[in-house]
Amino acid sequence: MSIGILGKKLGMTQIYDEKGVLQPVTVIAAGPCTILQKKTEEKEKYTAYQLGFDDAKEKNTANAMKGHFKKVKSSPKRFIREFRANKDENLNVGDAVTVTRFAPGQMVDVIGISKGKGFQGVVRRYRFAGGGAAHGSKSHRRAGAIGMRAWPGRIWKNARMPGHMGDVKITIQNLPVVQVRESENILLLRGSVPGSNGSYLVVRPAIKKPALKK
């Protein structure tokens, strides 16, 4: 498994590919990221790298984290994530990880936090059909009956009901890389990714291969 990169969603736009087809793309400011910690089989029993992205003010950094950054001679970072890696990854603490790890046409997975929608009903949250819209109907957008019989005499857990929607971790798999702009530290991915503009993202090489079309 190869490590990925951390970034920030800038927004969406459209570009033409080499065939003249208009493609919707998401623009991501990816890296450069600093390797803050290296975990090894000998010490932690697995191989991984801890990456930091986006400089933060020292006054807004916890004292414990200040020591962590000072140990590796790095400025404080806002966004820190860990990537599992193969043993043959030859990276060291303090090295920079840039968009050059990716190439056009490569498939990637993107992990982010979805937009928060607040408290929503079942029609919007779970796409329920809703009740009748006629004059005699008294429940247009309600969930309907949720009761059980004498047994079990209760409501099953995880029943779909109104509640908080969004603001959860989402993984979008197998998005193709359209362009890699090394000088600007920009990745262009075809399609949409979770979160609002300015939200942090994790971009990693795709784990699952897309199914072949028959």
Name the predicted role of every residue range.
Residues M1-K214:
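Extended basic (Lys/Arg/His-rich) segments that typically form rRNA-contacting surfaces
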